[in-house]
């Protein structure tokens, strides 16, 4: 079985990164699956947690941080170009690997990853309740920015609803939250 994880990077020492690395290591070492980690912008930054040598890490070289050197509206144009580059490079890798499953999060680019073509089932993991996707890290940043944040969250939610085959949540409460408007099977997993 071939499994591809897609994420921006595994450079932060956070809970999501730890869970992803633990799962990839388990699937590769214990269950002997072929596991790939596709990162968009890992670059030369080391992976934040020990990654099994059996997990194949491929960085796609899409530097999303480069869009922040521009002011709006050019920044939006650059962001769209980077999304297209991510889709193009990830699709090339998916075409070469032919995975059975593609795994990503609801928070990072489900609207792009959902468009990848192939026979792979798409599993999206939610590490927060659906309601919290519309809250930016900086909280209120002005009316226009708040509207944009809500639009972005709605786009992600619609992508999850449209493209994912299975949605995985961390708690039963999160599963209930996501169930509103989703027809996909929703699994609730408690990570220990």
Language-model features: where?
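Active-site proximal beta-strand in glycosyltransferases
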Residues: 101, 116-137
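Conserved small/polar residues in nucleotide/adenosyl-binding loops
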Residues: 191-192
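Short His-centered aromatic/hydrophobic patch
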Residues: 104-109, 126
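Membrane-proximal helix-turn-helix segments that form the acceptor-binding/catalytic region
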Residues: 89-93, 146-167
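Conserved alpha-helical elements of sugar-nucleotide-dependent glycosyltransferases
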Residues: 15-23
């Amino acid at each position: 079985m071939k499994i591809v994880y897609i994420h921006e990077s595994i450079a932060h020492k956070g809970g999501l990164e730890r869970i992803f690395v633990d799962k990839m290591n388990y699937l590769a070492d214990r269950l002997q699956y072929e596991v790939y980690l596709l990162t968009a912008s890992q670059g030369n930054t080391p992976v934040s947690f020990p990654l099994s040598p059996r997990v194949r890490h491929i960085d796609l070289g899409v530097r999303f941080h480069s869009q922040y050197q521009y002011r709006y509206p050019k920044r939006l144009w650059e962001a769209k170009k980077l999304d297209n580059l991510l889709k193009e490079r990830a699709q090339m890798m998916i075409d070469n690997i032919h995975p059975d499953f593609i795994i990503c999060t609801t928070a990072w680019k489900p609207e792009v990853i959902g468009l990848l073509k192939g026979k792979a089932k798409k599993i999206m993991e939610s590490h927060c309740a659906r309601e919290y996707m519309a809250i930016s890290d900086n909280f209120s940043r002005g009316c226009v920015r708040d509207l944009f944040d809500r639009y972005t969250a709605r786009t992600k939610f619609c992508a999850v609803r449209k493209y994912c085959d299975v949605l995985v949540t961390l708690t039963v409460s999160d599963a209930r939250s996501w169930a509103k408007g989703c027809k996909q099977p929703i699994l609730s997993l408690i990570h220990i």
